Amino acid sequence: MKKQRRFQGQDIHGMLLLDKPVGISSNGALQRVKQIYQARKAGHTGSLDPLANGLLPICLGEATKLSGFLLEADKRYQVMCRLGVVTTTGDADGEVLETHPVNELDRDEVAKFLSGFSGPQEQVPPMYSAIKHQGQRLYKLARQGIEVERKSRQVTIHTIKLTELVNNELGFEVFCSKGTYIRTLAEDIGRALGCGAHVIALRRTQVGSFGASDMISLEELEMLAETNVEALGNLLLPVGQILADWPAVNLIADLAYYLRQGQSVRVPQAPSEGWVRLIECGKGFFGVGRITEDGRIAPRRLIFSQSG
């Protein structure tokens, strides 16, 4: 008889650092994790294309209240491009639009050339993206052969460095701001080289302060679900650790009470601006707040349970 999972009927709270495999959508991976944990509520913190793999933080239960903050986080990718070929989608899943000869490239010159892409820049989102235009996803319009004008967005490439250059394939690692489309970056690089390019492999290795070292694959997760259910719970990061790099404000019980009631409070020696984690002395993390113009802390996301 199959062992009943201890999560059944319980509220599960925490974040899983999933290593999403190639060939599955981010939502598909999310639904499988949600089923394994039998979670009532789940959400991811920034989608990866089916062609891409790597870090996909998945929030369960109360952790979903904080998922939007990781959407805003910087991200790191390992990218492999094929030079000389332009596709409809900017990656290997698309149809070939153009082919061009690739001139012999010097590694040192290409490394220097790539560094020129660092810094703030305007980027036009690709048609094959989930951005909406008049209520419709752009990729749905693209599949109908419809192209619409898209507004450029400012993104920042913090660092970009060459990792490989062989047989018309160019690899690089990029650390960038939210909203950066790697397919568009690859196309821009190919265009600047005069030969075109598209992404053939993409791996995300960092989201905010979370790196690849603590990821677990979907295959390993499903195996644990059958053989070691207790270990599943241990894989979840507590809700209070999701924004651990934020400044914390320690609060006495009275001030914590008022914040839980939705009231702003004044706390001595609190930061002068920005977001803060709310910590009640003796009880721990219970949400996040923001410093108002008059120096008070206003509650923004309150957490009512951290484990299930």
UniProtKB/Swiss-Prot annotation:
| Any GO BP annotation | tRNA pseudouridine synthesis
- Protein's UniProt keywords contain Nuclease: no
- Catalysed reactions listed for this entry: uridine(55) in tRNA = pseudouridine(55) in tRNA
Task: Provide the E.C. number(s) assigned to this enzyme.
Answer: 5.4.99.25
Q: Which SUPFAM superfamilies match?
A: Pseudouridine synthase, PUA domain-like
Q: State the Gene Ontology terms under molecular function.
A: RNA binding; tRNA pseudouridine(55) synthase activity
Q: Which UniProt keywords apply?
A: Isomerase, tRNA processing
- From which domain of life does this come? Bacteria
What residue ranges are annotated as transmembrane?
Answer: none
Annotated active site residues, numbered on this chain, are 49
Enzyme class, first EC level, given as a word: isomerase
Please report a single Pfam family linked to this protein.
Answer: TruB_N
Q: Does the keyword tRNA processing apply?
A: yes
Family affiliation:
Belongs to the pseudouridine synthase TruB family. Type 1 subfamily.
Protein purpose: Responsible for synthesis of pseudouridine from uracil-55 in the psi GC loop of transfer RNAs.
What NCBIfam families is this protein classified in?
TruB
Q: What's the name of the protein?
A: tRNA pseudouridine synthase B
Species the sequence originates in:
Nitrosococcus oceani (strain ATCC 19707 / BCRC 17464 / JCM 30415 / NCIMB 11848 / C-107)
- The gene it comes from is truB
